[in-house]
Regions:
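Functional transmembrane-helix hotspots
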Residues: 91-139
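Individual transmembrane alpha-helix segments
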Residues: 145-186
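Juxtamembrane interface at the cytosolic side of transmembrane helices
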Residues: 2, 6, 61-63, 67, ...
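Hydrophobic secretory-pathway targeting helix
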Residues: 62-98
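Alpha-helical transmembrane segments of multi-pass membrane proteins
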Residues: 7, 11-15, 76-85, 179
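Transmembrane alpha-helical insertion/packing segments
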Residues: 1-68
C-alpha cells in the first residue's frame, strides 16, 4: 500500500468517523425531545443514506487513481475506511456515555425501551381486536390470545426494568459499545462486499 493511499484512507476514515460522532452528540442534545419515529428516521435512515453516499464516493475516488481496483482492493478500501470510522464512533460513545454523561444515556434509552413496549402493546391489541371484529376469533380464542399478549408484555416490562436497574447499580459497561462495534462491522462487511462488486473494475477478477 503506497503512502499516498494510506494517508487518503486515514483521512477519509477520520472524516467519516467525525460524521458518525455527530449522532451521539445530537442524541445527547436533542434525544429527549425526539419521538421514536424521528429518532429512528434520523439515527438509522439518514445515517445509512449519508454513509452509503460517502462510502460509494470514496470507492470511486480510489478507483480513479488505483491501477488495480478488483473486488479485493475495492472491498479493502471500503472496509478499512468504515472500520476506522466505526472505531472513532466507539471512542466517542465510550467518552460521552461512560465518562461524561452516563446518567443521560440511561435516561434516554430507558424511556425508549418503555416506548417500544408501549407501541408493541398497542399494535398487538389492535391486531387482535381487528381479528375479533372480523370474526376470525371467537370469544374464547380472543380471551386466550389477549391473556398471552398481556403475559408477554408483563414479562417484557419486568425484563426491561431489571435491565435498567442493573445498569444503574453497576454502571454502563464499555463492552456494550465494543459489542456494538463488532456487530456493526459484521454487517458493514457484508454491505461493503456488495458495494465492492459494483465499484470494482469489471475486467479485473480477484
Amino acid at each position: 500500500m503506497e503512502n499516498k493511499e494510506k494517508e487518503l484512507l486515514l483521512n477519509r476514515g477520520l472524516l467519516l468517523g467525525l460524521f458518525f460522532s455527530v449522532f451521539p452528540i445530537l442524541d445527547l442534545m436533542f434525544g429527549a425531545e425526539m419521538s421514536l419515529s424521528k429518532y429512528y428516521s434520523l439515527f438509522y435512515g439518514v445515517w445509512f443514506l449519508v454513509y452509503s453516499v460517502f462510502i460509494v464516493y470514496i470507492g470511486k475516488e480510489f478507483k480513479a487513481f488505483s491501477p488495480i481496483f478488483d473486488f479485493r482492493n475495492s472491498f479493502r478500501v471500503l472496509f478499512i475506511v468504515s472500520a476506522l470510522a466505526f472505531s472513532i464512533l466507539t471512542v466517542t460513545r465510550i467518552s460521552l456515555w461512560n465518562v461524561f454523561y452516563p446518567v443521560k444515556y440511561i435516561e434516554l434509552n430507558e424511556v425508549r425501551d418503555v416506548k417500544l413496549i408501549s407501541i408493541f402493546s398497542v399494535i398487538s391489541k389492535s391486531t387482535l381486536d381487528n381479528a375479533y371484529t372480523n370474526g376470525d376469533l371467537n370469544d374464547d380464542e380472543y380471551d386466550e390470545s389477549l391473556t398471552k399478549i398481556e403475559d408477554q408484555l408483563e414479562f417484557a416490562e419486568s425484563s426491561i426494568a431489571e435491565k435498567w436497574v442493573y445498569i444503574k447499580d453497576n454502571g454502563i459497561s464499555k463492552s456494550l459499545f465494543i459489542g456494538n462495534l463488532i456487530y456493526n462491522l459484521f454487517f458493514i462487511a457484508i454491505y461493503n462486499a456488495i458495494l465492492a462488486l459494483f465499484l470494482r473494475r469489471k475486467n479485473e477478477i480477484a
